[in-house]
Amino acid sequence: MFKFFSSFGDSNEKEIRALEPLVDKINQLENSFTTLSDEALKAKTIEFRARLKDTFETTTAGIQEDITSTTAELAEAQKIADNSKQSRLKAKLESLNKDLSAKETTALNGILPEAFAAVREASRRTIGLRHYDVQLIGGMVLHHGKIAEMRTGEGKTLVATLPLYLNSLLGKGVHLVTVNDYLARRDAYWMGPVYHALGVSVSSIYPMQTPTEELPSRLFDPDYTSEIPGDPWTHFRPISRQEAYKADITYGTSTEFGFDYLRDNLRPDLAQCVQRDMNYAIVDEIDNLLIDEARTPLIISAPDTEAGKLYDVFARLSPRLVAVKDYEINEKDRNAELTEDGWANVEKLLSREGVMKGNSLYDPQNAPLIRHLRNALSAKEFYKKDHQYVVKEGEIIIIDEFTGRMMLGRRYSEGLHQAIEAKEHVKVQQESKTYATVTIQNLFRMYRKLCGMTGTAATEAEEFSKIYKLEVVIIPTNKPAVREDYGDQIYKDQSAKFKAVVNEIDEMRKLGRPVLVGTVSIENSEMLSNMLKRQGIEHKVLNAKQHEKEAQVVAEAGKPGAVTVATNMAGRGVDILLGGKEPTKDDAKVYNEWQAHHQQVLEAGGLHVIGTERHESRRIDNQLRGRSGRQGDPGSSRFYVALDDDIMRRFGSERIQGIMEWAGMDENTPIENGLVSRTLENAQKRVEGYHFDVRKHLVEYDDVVNKHREVIYAERRKILSGADLKSNILDMIREEIITQTAEHTRGYDSSEWNLDGLVTHLNGIFTLPAEINAEALAKLSQEEITDLLTRTAEELYQKKEDETGAGSMRLLERIIMLHTLDSLWVEHLTIMENLRREIGLQAFAQRDPLIAYKNEGHVRFQELLETIKHDVVHNIYRIGIQIQHQTESATAKAASSPVQQQKPLPAAPAAAIPGVSAKAATQSTTPAAKEIGRNDPCPCGSGKKYKKCCGK
């Protein structure tokens, strides 16, 4: 790993040097662009696009055709599970896409100096900001699909305009992914005049701000003026989500881009889809998204089953279990395992509650109880109020551990959220059923070109390289950094540590320096606030409970003597300016007062940052330090640590405790030396390594479902795009007839054939003419039977089409295919979730759980594909056009209606059609019969189990 960082440093220097000649070229062009009129500057975009078009027509036409044909071949290979062909075609497709990207990059590189010069000039004219040379380098790094590490205050928002404009010239749409919905609007609106001056459209997508909004989207339009009094987004014109994606540049949050992708793959009509292909994305604060958020999947779900009384039972039971005696806590892995005494105690308590079946918790009937028990213990030991969540208006709202923000609409999965609700005695919500899901990792790996910006990526360079194939380039600062980072001070306990923190806050405040204090939880921020109040120290608190005041608090945090206590949210994306927010020069008195404050803070030493606890990740610590010393300003930082801090307790306190006892330190005397700091850093590295393994593990497991998703979503697109479904369905019918004929005509002697069973089975699909019966079929050979039945099926299909009309039949084919695909895909996701939950037991059998999951997942996916064919064949003749129209309208309604969310803003899937499932529709046209068990003999007489024959 150390070799990795050594070579990383060398390559970074070479990368920067290689870009300097381009910076010189852009600077040489500056004067010529300054002399252009506004109309001539805007016309440059038309010129650039024309030049790119001429280049592409001669260099990429053949590649595009090959990509289209290879994609179609791959889809067919995936359907028939031809693994060797899939591997070959995937490699070919990857190579073709690389060739296309290389051609596009070469063409864009040819106009890069002029395009960057145009953006620099447009920015200077419209918003008064001229890109520094280092910002030009940052823009080039982003254009080349890499991560630009830029320190806080170096102007990442402005840097992004360069590659966004350049790549938008291809006309394929580009995305800027922000960390929150405020920045999705602010950055698009702030940079809007720059893009408008160049004739490029820019939009913003963000989550609902009010219950009446539906997929809110805005387009920057100087000719539009909002009628809302005091609207900060005066020139943001409301548009549809589809229009937002048609804009040249789209700003938005990762969740909105992700849920739009999932929603598009639930829609019943291609015309309702909103996204274009995923072309180029810049991810702001990329470490936050691809590292911190990577373990969190995006899920569209709907209410499924009632929560039941078990959550309340275990909420009453868990406080009666005692740590160590009844269960052992593993702090590192964050799980609790019952001891032998614990098992006995739990069995006794559950028996009293009357919920345990049999005499042992190990009985398979009690498997659900074990899941409830684990969730209840996790809720008790690892999920604390005002740390991991808050209780607000009778709801449990998750707190993002990395940003400190409330994650409205998000819920823990697999029953954990319900366990926490039961613990806090709020209403336990229904469990949910997953209809569509994708991890953040796989979502962003879909982009043809991905890059990002952050102030802290170097510590995770190895992970970015291994998982995302992204290189990190550290961009030099415009001015030398002068912030002083003091060594950590370690105390024996929390009480002594926070007393020292209050003393340092008071000292810095009296010097006229603003102080930012970072805490890891809401509880700690409020506890420190109470200590400051008792000392009479005026301060502001910024945590998830006061997130509405965030922009205002951060704007004032740089004033002389200002004290701000904040959780990790600390205004990421908003700079803390020394002296406070810089006013306009319209009011000379106000501006002069700000200048005096600004100078006063500079002379006092700038912003002082205090960290009250080391985070599990060094990046989060560095982000807090990075609030100070922006753009060459003075500043300082220091971390205070106690031996009973979470990270110390879990990963390193014993060694440091020994050092302190050896040194004879009392609780009020801190220790500060290199050995302690190194021990702390090593503890953080171990935690980072652990989380890296977890994320890598997540990718490997999700890749299994991702392959399934690619096949199903590609097939769905094909259905929506008007593919010839009739020939596909007739092929399925022929395949079913061939399979069933072979099954029922085994043996050399026709007397051994089960022709009654064959006729019964086929009559379950369509009604055979009276003359085609077992007696008539007995006179034919196996081949003749197949030909006769196939011909009859085709004639009956044509008869149905003649009766309903060709147009209606095509619509019916589409609806049945869509509904079957959607409903069975939902079932498959549930099967895969359950499989993943249980697969860990394979380790006890000395089998690799991942390999077992891949193998079992492959078997289940083949079963899914076969079941899709089976259900389509068994429904196409039976479902009438009236029911089909109901299905169409219900599908459209379901795809656009919001439902209970596991993540923000899901919509109900096309499959969720109340009362009009394929099964229900079929039953409405056939007589009721006694229900057949899946393991019962099939009534067709084949001798096989029902689930393996007609019950497939």
UniProtKB/Swiss-Prot annotation:
One GO MF annotation is: protein-exporting ATPase activity
Query: SUPFAM superfamilies this protein is in?
Result: Helical scaffold and wing domains of SecA, P-loop containing nucleoside triphosphate hydrolases, Pre-protein crosslinking domain of SecA
- List ligand-binding residues for Zn(2+): C938, C940, C949, C950
Q: What is its EC number?
A: 7.4.2.8
How does it sit in the bilayer?
Peripheral membrane protein
Binding sites annotated in the UniProt record for ATP: Q135, G153, E154, G155, K156, T157, D575
Q: Which UniProt keywords apply?
A: ATP-binding, Cell membrane, Cytoplasm, Membrane, Metal-binding, Nucleotide-binding, Protein transport, Translocase, Translocation, Transport, Zinc
Subcellular localization is given as:
Cell membrane; Cytoplasm
Q: List the InterPro entries.
A: Helicase_ATP-bd (IPR014001), Helicase_C-like (IPR001650), P-loop_NTPase (IPR027417), SEC_C_motif (IPR004027), SecA (IPR000185), SecA_CS (IPR020937), SecA_DEAD (IPR011115), SecA_motor_DEAD (IPR014018)
GO biological process terms held by the UniProt record: intracellular protein transmembrane transport; protein import; protein targeting; protein transport by the Sec complex
Note accompanying the cofactor annotation: May bind 1 zinc ion per subunit.
Q: Where is the composition biased (Basic and acidic residues)?
A: 614-624
Positions of region (Disordered): 614-636, 916-946
What is the required cofactor set for this protein? Zn(2+)
The source's domain of life comes to: Bacteria
Catalysed reactions, semicolon-separated: ATP + H2O + cellular proteinSide 1 = ADP + phosphate + cellular proteinSide 2
What cellular component terms from Gene Ontology apply here? cell envelope Sec protein transport complex; cytosol; plasma membrane
CDD domains attached to this UniProt entry: DEXDc_SecA, SF2_C_secA
Give the protein's function.
Part of the Sec protein translocase complex. Interacts with the SecYEG preprotein conducting channel. Has a central role in coupling the hydrolysis of ATP to the transfer of proteins into and across the cell membrane, serving as an ATP-driven molecular motor driving the stepwise translocation of polypeptide chains across the membrane.
How this chain assembles, per its entry, is: Monomer and homodimer. Part of the essential Sec protein translocation apparatus which comprises SecA, SecYEG and auxiliary proteins SecDF. Other proteins may also be involved.
Q: Which family does it belong to?
A: Belongs to the SecA family.
Name the HAMAP family for this protein. Answer: SecA
Query: What PANTHER family has UniProt attached to this entry?
Result: CHLOROPLAST PROTEIN-TRANSPORTING ATPASE, SECA INNER MEMBRANE COMPONENT OF SEC PROTEIN SECRETION SYSTEM
- Protein known as: Protein translocase subunit SecA
Organism, by scientific name, is Dehalococcoides mccartyi (strain ATCC BAA-2100 / JCM 16839 / KCTC 5957 / BAV1)
Gene encoding this chain?
secA
